[in-house]
Amino acid sequence: MYQINNKTWSIRLVRSDSPMLIRSDGSYTVGMCDRTTQTIYISNLLQGKFLRKVLIHEICHSAMFSYGIDMSVEQEELFCDLIATYGDEIIGIVDNVFRALKEVA
């Protein structure tokens, strides 16, 4: 369990054929963030770097829901994909620039 903006979220690993992983179009996905139950469902078949990427993506959704950030589904997916794919690189660059600025100051 974790909290974002005083909202408690839980993460559950579920079978890959769980109804919790069915999209609105009837297809299966590997991760799903349910704003109603404040639960993230992740396929128990995931591991390693892909599991981490899916967790980042779904936790990004939970942050958006917790802070009331409203976007179209397409925009929200693009944003969560951006953070899940490039977030480590962006934060690493910021950390390096921040350290360099502190050394100059």
Model-derived features: positions:
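Metalloprotease/metallohydrolase-associated module, dominated by Zn2+-dependent proteases
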Residues: 1-50, 66-105
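Active-site recognition of the HExxH zinc-binding catalytic motif
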Residues: 53-65
